[in-house]
From Swiss-Prot:
Compartmental location: Cytoplasm
This protein's encoding gene: panB
Pfam families, per database record: Pantoate_transf
Record field: catalytic activity: 3-methyl-2-oxobutanoate + (6R)-5,10-methylene-5,6,7,8-tetrahydrofolate + H2O = 2-dehydropantoate + (6S)-5,6,7,8-tetrahydrofolate
Span list, region Disordered: 1-29
Main location: cytoplasm
Function description: Catalyzes the reversible reaction in which hydroxymethyl group from 5,10-methylenetetrahydrofolate is transferred onto alpha-ketoisovalerate to form ketopantoate.
Textual note on the cofactor: Binds 1 Mg(2+) ion per subunit.
Cofactor: Mg(2+)
Pathway connected to this protein: Cofactor biosynthesis; (R)-pantothenate biosynthesis; (R)-pantoate from 3-methyl-2-oxobutanoate: step 1/2
Annotated TM spans: none
Superkingdom classification of source: Bacteria
Organism, scientific name: Saccharopolyspora erythraea (strain ATCC 11635 / DSM 40517 / JCM 4748 / NBRC 13426 / NCIMB 8594 / NRRL 2338)
Protein's recorded name: 3-methyl-2-oxobutanoate hydroxymethyltransferase
Length: 293
């Protein structure tokens, strides 16, 4: 069967016809569709994906030309302060999805199905996914797991809901996997490939490969006709995703080996807050130009 693809007009060039522009200056662009991502794979063009949990980052990333935004269950750590992704709920994620869809004018917004909201049955998965689509305005959903969840993916796709798969290291199952361990090595390579094929056959439009050996990721990417999205899976995947707080340096603690920091936003905010505090205490703010007669 084929993935659930949208039926908008063909767009040339980058997905949705978007262009990179400074924040606040980008023209309105057409919505990125799942088939645009497939076209990029067919042309051999890599594409980026970032997480987003609010309207401001969604708008900034959208205008920077990021074609896919993931409202991940990583909000558990990065918004709500939980130690793992396990505690976050559907009720906590839906408002974040709603905010991101308001901020993103052209990016495809994917909502994570959190732990406990889909595993029991395809019917449970469908009910949860429908909530994210109707209440959150998501354009697609993501769920973790391989062959045991192919039926869940098929049920969603048959209902018209695009699905992104997620295999390799799956954070919701970290206790079963024995902690954060690289997947797809040795005998696991065939298991990983079988999971990827099952998700594709069920209709997934893409599959995330997390903390997977580069060789296994290269093999899976070559075997699949749908895009692979790597996070700690080497350079051969069709796309790459990072958690935005890691990418931008908001997380000042230790990060995973696969993370590259492109900014020191945490330090910038800390310095701005300190300067504000110093000016308030010293009487420099508010100045006359910040006051009314």
């Amino acid at each position: 069967m084929t993935a659930a693809h949208d039926r908008s007009e063909n767009q040339p060039g980058r997905p949705g016809g978007e262009t990179t522009a400074p924040y606040g200056s980008a023209p309105r662009r057409r919505r990125v569709r799942t088939r645009h991502l497939l076209e990029l794979k067919q042309r051999g063009e890599a594409w980026p994906m970032l997480t987003s949990y609010d309207m401001y980052t969604a708008r900034i990333f959208d205008e920077a030309g990021i074609p896919v935004l993931l409202v991940g269950d990583s909000a558990a750590n990065n918004v709500y302060g939980y130690d793992t992704t396990v505690p976050v709920t559907v009720e906590e994620l839906i408002p974040l999805v709603r905010a991101v869809t308001r901020g993103a004018r052209s990016a495809l917004v994917v909502a994570d199905l959190p732990f406990g909201s889909y595993e029991a049955s395809p019917e449970q998965a469908l009910a949860t996914a429908v909530r994210f689509m109707k209440e959150g305005g998501a354009h697609a959903v993501k769920l973790e797991g391989g062959r045991p969840f192919a039926r869940h993916v098929e049920a969603l796709v048959n209902a018209g809901i695009p699905v992104m798969g997620h295999i390799g290291f799956t954070p919701q199952s970290e206790h079963t996997l024995g902690g954060y361990r690289v997947q797809g090595r040795g005998e696991q390579a065939e298991e990983l490939a079988a999971d990827a094929r099952a998700l594709q056959d069920a209709g997934a439009f893409a599959v995330v490969l997390e903390m997977v050996s580069s060789d296994s990721a290269k093999r899976v990417t070559a075997e699949l006709t749908i895009p692979t999205v790597g996070i700690g899976a080497g350079p051969e995947c069709d796309a790459q995703v990072l958690v935005w707080t890691d990418m931008a340096g908001m997380n000042t603690g230790r990060t995973a080996r696969f993370v590259k920091r492109y900014a020191d936003l945490g330090g910038t905010l800390a310095r701005a807050a300190q300067e504000f505090a110093d000016e308030v205490r010293g009487g420099a703010f508010p100045a006359p130009e910040h006051s009314f007669e």
